[in-house]
Design a protein with these regions (language model features):
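Long, contiguous binding/interaction regions
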Residues: 1-51, 55-81
């Protein structure tokens, strides 16, 4: 993979307790959210879960690994793609 590039980070969790804010705060510690594409959120049919796609300006594989590691370790994150 070539860097820098815009890269989508997909995260899923329960639709409560400002999950979106939590995910953004973790990602923004490591990267800049791409302003044009930004954030796309989708709530499940029953409203219990939310999936977020956050497009970031990725500078390196190490940066992506750090983002995935921190998000995956958080108890409120159920799944990542």
């Amino acid at each position: 993979m070539d860097f820098p590039r815009v890269f989508p980070v997909k995260v899923m969790g329960a639709n409560k307790d400002d999950f979106e804010g939590l995910v953004l705060s973790i990602i923004q510690k490591h990267a800049v959210v791409a302003a044009k594409e930004g954030l796309v959120s989708r709530v499940s049919r029953n409203g219990r879960f939310i999936s977020l796609t956050v497009r970031i300006n990725a500078e390196s594989q190490e940066q992506l690994d750090n983002i995935y590691r921190e998000l995956s370790a958080h108890e409120k994150v159920l799944m990542m793609l």
